[in-house]
Amino acid sequence: MKFDIVIIGGGLVGASLATSLKGSHLTVALIDAAAPTPLPNDASWDNRIYTISPGSADFLRSLGLWQQIDASRVTPIYEMNVFGDDGAAEIDFGAYESGLPELAFVTENRQLQAVLWGALLNDSQNITVFSSAKCTAISWHDSGVNILLADGRTIQASLIVGADGVNSWVREQAGITVEHHRYEQIGVVANFSTELAHHNIAYQWFRRDGVLAFLPLPDKRVSIVWSTHETHANELRNISDEEFSQRVSEASNRVLGRLQLITQPAGFPLNFVHVSKLVKPRLVLIGDAAHGIHPLAGQGVNLGLRDVKALSEILKKDEIYYDYGDYILLLRYERARKADITAMETVTDGLHKLFNSQDPIIRRFRNLGLTMTNRLPFIKSKLMQHALN
């Protein structure tokens, strides 16, 4: 079997790229080790929650995907309040100030995945999907790439796109070097029902034990991410539901009153990943395979969707290109994405180091910085414009 492009990894970013190339003259294969998971019939909530920027929502809308998500499972954010760790410092951002109807949207991973896979499986057109398929070897040669599957099938391609996550097997096979360090933190995620209405406000607290974020869900519900050191994270995941709810409520200064746990807490390790290059001849990296950032800014998925948008525009613009794995063509993608990725890596890593420091002088100045920025509309406006764009 031969294709122009083979995407390895069918998560949100990989499936989005496949969908964005649907209907083009390109022949595309999407390979994923897992099988598509149908949405549950009950009203339960997914622990994996994404903050989707207006730009990402517009991109998904242009693909005909955003409109298909169940509107009752999408919550707009109208305001965001951020607090320092001295009990007084804070900064707030509002949609009204940004000139937009909302700052962002909150929705579940499984809602997005269901829409993406539905679009691919129900009307595949030029896309061939290999689900429950494991890649075991890749061999590069001058005229293309061979991918060997565990069942013995061989797939040929002009270009491989690695979209297989932060511990990318494709990246390793390509020999791309990585700057990779653990933050020695776990992101503890869970969903709660709340006593008080959230009024579509997102909250974030920079605390001495980490960063706690509240994202609004429909009705009186929130999703939380508590990025904290490993010992504390393990403790939080092993106490009773009642005690965990109490701890989160106290850490948030009871801003939404009493909390009741509605999904069991889960945890994921936090890592910084910077790749030496995004492309090689016949290879492109996108999403978490191309970058790994701290979740304190909630921008990981948006960074990946911007990868998808840039790459799909380049590939579709050159649909009659003689060789989609040509290094000169692929360098256009790297040039288009490098500055954005580097800036986001630098900002999120810097913020983590700044707010993770226990130095009393640094603590004083970071809290002062929050307060002063909140009092300077011009600077705050510039920060908002950069984040929203």
How would you label these PLM feature ranges?
Residues 313-389:
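C-terminal helical "tail/cap" subdomain of flavin- and related membrane-associated enzymes
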Residues 22-45:
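Glycine-rich FAD pyrophosphate-binding loop
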Residues 44-84:
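N-terminal FAD cofactor-binding segment of flavoenzymes
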Residues 3-30:
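N-terminal Rossmann-like FAD-binding beta1-loop-alpha1 element of flavoenzymes
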Residues 232-327:
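FAD/FMN-dependent oxidoreductases across multiple families
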Residues 60, 146, 159-258, 262-265:
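Conserved FAD-binding catalytic core of PHBH/FMO-like flavoproteins
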Residues 74-173, 181-186:
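Conserved N-terminal helical subregion
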Residues 13, 36, 167:
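Conserved Rossmann-like nucleotide-cofactor binding loop
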